[in-house]
Each structure stands twice: as structure tokens, then as C-alpha cells.
């Protein structure tokens, strides 16, 4: 018999009754029923109930065990009585009557309980992550992540992609976030950067003649934490393809993503591919976001003209100043009590808005603060434009075009959630396309890249030379699921002349471009294929599949929201001798003044 186990703790069934088995695992729960002591023994695979009869040689040893001690139990498998069968466990028809028990490792008093559903502060969970990972839900999430990654590897390989690894120590690049820098000991005063993405390397692989690349790529960005963004590092399904159009990229990855969510989505509905394509401008207009949640049926309507020169002075003034007014319908809320509308007004103020105006379409006409000062014909035009019916209400967002669009999107999400309109049993995918190539920096007034600087502009060099930069669209796209951006991607700018001109418009001289991107730019001078790709976030996909509120619930050892590893104690000071070896000196910011 094996020293530690003949079976795992999830393997034994009624058909095994009568055999002698040996199990090893952790003491999950211990229950004393007078003449019998029960221990639920847990390992990676499941739980088996072990029975220790009073008076037996093993009873005293079992009685002294603390939860989470590691033991090996040898005994006879017996069927449970019908009234003691546990249908919640795959092993629930049997139990192991212990004959010997060996303690492999004892556990101290636990700082957090592993068994049960008790909640603990996240700081405590992260400090004792090795215990937290034993808990059923988190353990299941991490296994889901592992299975998702294995599935993605198989799918990409089956579709002709080759897995490559790209450098972790590389040069800094403007990916939109701060780099993590690594000082060079051999080259004092110079630094490597951890890659924000394998962007340049995967493009260089296409230039090198490899047709289809992928990897489960680690990416490093020194940016603040959000529910859907982990500080420090994250992983993405990074892929690139040669000789492809935008539609080729979509057609290749849609069945991978759709198939993944069908495989691991627990029976929830998944958008049938091809996924909808929504232009960026249309997304901002209809959904108030470039990552719309299509499970929400509410659509935003532009009603600017209904308020131009109208009797409602506040909105008329905004429109006269170049602003816009967007309307968000709220079906069936016209009869709601005043408190419903007051609470939404309070919420809007908490979001930084002045309030949330509305019109109620009652059987005897339009009602509410706005309707009192708005001509009836204009109110009726709003009702028709929004598709509202009698008994509905319509809410409004007004201001500068982008501000009004985004706040209308926030209102749409709030109403969809509060009114129970969002179907939690679906995964709704879409592509956002036709992103602007450039935007104006509000602080400096300069033209800057709006997203990825390596995207091919629609219209190529002719567009760069002949169009207002703010009107140029890029062959750039995002894949969105349930309001979560899974990835950005693009057809790449593979021509040096187009790239240099694109960077020139954004304020980069040729010398600076050569200095920062000379490796890739030089490679393009020796024959580069048209190519494109994307990089769906693994962490975000698993978060959606596991129905978790934040990424830390699907990462084995995440940093906390302040970018700290509480378990390993990172970041941490380093000895002065090490700093000297690296030719570094620390200049700390001044301590904040007290009082």
C-alpha cells in the first residue's frame, strides 16, 4: 500500500465498500457525536468523511487534532445508512472507518477559517493567502483559471498558432501607463523596463516570417488598481497574425472566445458569432460608453434639438453653448413615488452631476420639473424620439458632448441595474471599431494618440497628409463582454513612412521615434507583412466566468489595492550595499506636514 494514499479524497464510491483504503489530506471539519468522532478529510479533489469510534486506538489521536492539520488515515470503506447519505458530496454514500491515523503536520490556531462561508477582511485573506486558497470557492476559481488557460492553449494551437515567449527585460515604450523599471548593474544609470505588453516583439516575429503567434503573456503596468484591473501584473492571450484584415482577426478569435465562454460559462447564453460591430461614435451615442453592456436593453437618444431655444432655460443655454442633451428611458417608472426620483437625484449628485432631470409621460401629458417649462410639442418629440410610452419616465444628461455622453452611460447602467433589466444569465459580446486615431489633450491642447500608437490609420498616408487629424479613424478595435473591455487590438502600421508621419502628427520627431522604436522601425525597412492581432485579458475573462466582483478573486497571489504583497512583504527596502552596487541613491519625497 502506498505510504500516503491509495485514493484521493474525492474518489471513493459505494462500489468501493469493503475495501481497505488510505487517504491523506487536511482536517476540514471535526464533529464529536458522543460515541463517534467524525472528521471530514479534504484534499485537492474532494472530501471524505472518516469515522473514529470511541474506545478505538485512533480515537484519542483524532480528538486532539486541530482543523487544517494534515493526516493520513487508513481504514475500511463502508456504505452509509440511507438516512445519513450526504447528497451534496460525490463521496456522500460512503465513509472511511479509521483503523490507523498518522499525523503528518499539525496546524496552529487559524487566523481565518477554511471551512464554511464566513467572510474575512481582504487584508487578512491576502496575508494568509495560502489558507485562503484552501477555501472551496477560491480554490475552485484558481482551478477554473488553470483550465481556461489550458483550453486556450489547445484552441490556439489547433488554429495554427505557435506559442512563443518574449523578453521580460526590455526597453520602455509609451503603452499608456508607467513602466516598472529595473536598474542595470552592468550599465550604471541605465534601466530595463518590464513589458507593458509584448507589442513590439510580437510584431517583430511577424516581420521575421512567423505567420501566427500567441502566448499567455505576463504584462506589467505601474497603475492604480480597479475592480477589473490588477495593480502590477496581469496576463493576456496575446496573439498576432500576418497578411490579415480586421475582419480576418475577428473571424479567427470569435470562435475561440465564444467557445471558451460556452465551455466554462455554466450554461449561460453566449452571443453567437460573428459578434456585433459597433462604431466608437455610435457606442458613445447609444450606450454612453466605448465598452457597452449589451445585456442592458436601454438605449440613449440625442435630444439636443428638442431643447434648442426651448422654454427650459438650463438646457437651452447648454445647447446654445455647443453642448448636447441625451435622454435615457426608464420603462414603467412613471408611476413610481417621488422618493424614487429623489434618490436618483441624490445619486447623480454623488457622481458629480448637478442632478438628474426627468420627464414623466402620464396619461394626461408630460409631468415633472422639466415638463413645466417645456413646450408640449417638444415633450412629445422627446417621447417619440426615445420610444417612450405612457407610464414611462425619461431622464436627461446635458453638457459638453463627451461629458454628457459618459454621464448618460452611467445613468443607463444605473437604471438598468436598479430596474432589474440586466440578464445575469448571458454573456453579450461586441466589437467596438473605428476608434479615432488622435485626440486633443485637454490640458496641453496638443494632438496625441488616442490609443495604440502602432495602429494603421484608415486611409493610410493619404489620410495623414490630407485630413484633420481629429477626423482620422484607426484600424483599431476593442472586444467587450458584459460591459468589460477584454482587449484592445489593431491592424498594425507596418510601413516606416506612414509610422513616421503618424508620430510626427502626435509631436514626435523622427530622431525621437528612431531612438525609442528604432528596433521595430528598422525591421520594417527590410520587408514587413501587413499584420494585426489582439490580446484578450485572461484575468478578466476568468473574473466574468467565475462571476466575481474583482480580479483578486481569480488570481492565486494578487497584490492588494495599494500594490503590496502582504504575504511576501513586497515592496521592501533593500540594503545600502545593494543600492551602491546598482549605482542608485534614494531621494524620498518630503513627509507630509502634520496638522
From Swiss-Prot:
Start and end residues of each stretch annotated as Aspartate: 199-202
Residues where L-aspartate binds: 175, 221, 451, 492
Binding site for ATP: 221-223, 485, 537-540
UniProt GO MF annotations: aspartate-tRNA ligase activity; aspartate-tRNA(Asn) ligase activity; ATP binding; nucleic acid binding
Principal location class: cytoplasm
Annotated GO biological process: aspartyl-tRNA aminoacylation
InterPro entries attached to this UniProt entry: Aa-tRNA-synt_II (IPR004364), aa-tRNA-synth_II (IPR006195), aa-tRNA-synth_II/BPL/LPL (IPR045864), Asp-tRNA-ligase_1 (IPR004524), Asp-tRNA-ligase_1_N (IPR047089), Asp/Asn-tRNA-synth_IIb (IPR002312), AspRS_core (IPR047090), GAD-like_sf (IPR004115)
A GO cellular component annotation in the UniProt record: cytoplasm
Pfam families membership: GAD, tRNA-synt_2, tRNA_anti-codon
Domain of life assignment: Bacteria
Feature type site, description Important for tRNA non-discrimination: 33
Assembly, per entry: Homodimer.
Name of protein: Aspartate--tRNA(Asp/Asn) ligase
Organism: Acidiphilium cryptum (strain JF-5)
Lineage of the species this protein comes from: Bacteria, Pseudomonadati, Pseudomonadota, Alphaproteobacteria, Acetobacterales
Amino acid at each position: 500500500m502506498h505510504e500516503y494514499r491509495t485514493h484521493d479524497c474525492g474518489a471513493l464510491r459505494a462500489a468501493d465498500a469493503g475495501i481497505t483504503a488510505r487517504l491523506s489530506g487536511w482536517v476540514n471539519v471535526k464533529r464529536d457525536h458522543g460515541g463517534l468522532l467524525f472528521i471530514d478529510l479534504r484534499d485537492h479533489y474532494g472530501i471524505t468523511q472518516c469515522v473514529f469510534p470511541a474506545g478505538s486506538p485512533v480515537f484519542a489521536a483524532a480528538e486532539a487534532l486541530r482543523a487544517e492539520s494534515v493526516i493520513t488515515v487508513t481504514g475500511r470503506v463502508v456504505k452509509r445508512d440511507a438516512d445519513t447519505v450526504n447528497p451534496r458530496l460525490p463521496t456522500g454514500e460512503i465513509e472511511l472507518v479509521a483503523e490507523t491515523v498518522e499525523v503528518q503536520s499539525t496546524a496552529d490556531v487559524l487566523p481565518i477559517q477554511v471551512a464554511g462561508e464566513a467572510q474575512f477582511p481582504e487584508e487578512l485573506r491576502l496575508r494568509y493567502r495560502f489558507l485562503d486558497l484552501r477555501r472551496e470557492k477560491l480554490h475552485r476559481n484558481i482551478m477554473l483559471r488553470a483550465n481556461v488557460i489550458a483550453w486556450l492553449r489547445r484552441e490556439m494551437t489547433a488554429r495554427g498558432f505557435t506559442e512563443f515567449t518574449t523578453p521580460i527585460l526590455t526597453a520602455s515604450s509609451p503603452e499608456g501607463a508607467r513602466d516598472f523599471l529595473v536598474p542595470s548593474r552592468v550599465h550604471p544609470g541605465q534601466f530595463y523596463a518590464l513589458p507593458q505588453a509584448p507589442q513590439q516583439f510580437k510584431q517583430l516575429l511577424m516581420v521575421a516570417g512567423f505567420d501566427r503567434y500567441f502566448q499567455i503573456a505576463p504584462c506589467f503596468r505601474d497603475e492604480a488598481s480597479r475592480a477589473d484591473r490588477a495593480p502590477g501584473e496581469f496576463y493576456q492571450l496575446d496573439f498576432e497574425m500576418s497578411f490579415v484584415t480586421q475582419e480576418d482577426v475577428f473571424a479567427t478569435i470569435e470562435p475561440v472566445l465564444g467557445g471558451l465562454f460556452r465551455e466554462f460559462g455554466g450554461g449561460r447564453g453566449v452571443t453567437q458569432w460573428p459578434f456585433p460591430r459597433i462604431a466608437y461614435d455610435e457606442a458613445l451615442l447609444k450606450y454612453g460608453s466605448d465598452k457597452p453592456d449589451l445585456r442592458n436593453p436601454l438605449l440613449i437618444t440625442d435630444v439636443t434639438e428638442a431643447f434648442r431655444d426651448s422654454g427650459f432655460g438650463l438646457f437651452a443655454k447648454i445647447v446654445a453653448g455647443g453642448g448636447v442633451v441625451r435622454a435615457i428611458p426608464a420603462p414603467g417608472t412613471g408611476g413610481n413615488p417621488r422618493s424614487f426620483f429623489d434618490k436618483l437625484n441624490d445619486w447623480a449628485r454623488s457622481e458629480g452631476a448637478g442632478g438628474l432631470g426627468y420627464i414623466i409621460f402620464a396619461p394626461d401629458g408630460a409631468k415633472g420639473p422639466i415638463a413645466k417649462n417645456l413646450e408640449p410639442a417638444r415633450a412629445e418629440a422627446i417621447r417619440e424620439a426615445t420610444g417612450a410610452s405612457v407610464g414611462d419616465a425619461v431622464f436627461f444628461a446635458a453638457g459638453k458632448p463627451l461629458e454628457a455622453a459618459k454621464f448618460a452611460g452611467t445613468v443607463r447602467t444605473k437604471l438598468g441595474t436598479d430596474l432589474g433589466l440586466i440578464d445575469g444569465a448571458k454573456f453579450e459580446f461586441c466589437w467596438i471599431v473605428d476608434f479615432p486615431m488622435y485626440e486633443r489633450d485637454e490640458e496641453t491642447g496638443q494632438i496625441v494618440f488616442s490609443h495604440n500608437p502602432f495602429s494603421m490609420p484608415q486611409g493610410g498616408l493619404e489620410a495623414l497628409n490630407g485630413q484633420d487629424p481629429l477626423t482620422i479613424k484607426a484600424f483599431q478595435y476593442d472586444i467587450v463582454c458584459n460591459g468589460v473591455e477584454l482587449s484592445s487590438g489593431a491592424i498594425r502600421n507596418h510601413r516606416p513612412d506612414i509610422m513616421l508621419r503618424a508620430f510626427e502628427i502626435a509631436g514626435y520627431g523622427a530622431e525621437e521615434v528612431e531612438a525609442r522604436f528604432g528596433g521595430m522601425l528598422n525591421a520594417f525597412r527590410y520587408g514587413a507583412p501587413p499584420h494585426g492581432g489582439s490580446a484578450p485579458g485572461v484575468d478578466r475573462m476568468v473574473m466574468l466566468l467565475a462571476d466575481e466582483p474583482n480580479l483578486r478573486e481569480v488570481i492565486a497571489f494578487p497584490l492588494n489595492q495599494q500594490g503590496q504583497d502582504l504575504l511576501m512583504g513586497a515592496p521592501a527596502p533593500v540594503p545600502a550595499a545593494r543600492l551602491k552596487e546598482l549605482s542608485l541613491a534614494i531621494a524620498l519625497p518630503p513627509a507630509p506636514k502634520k496638522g
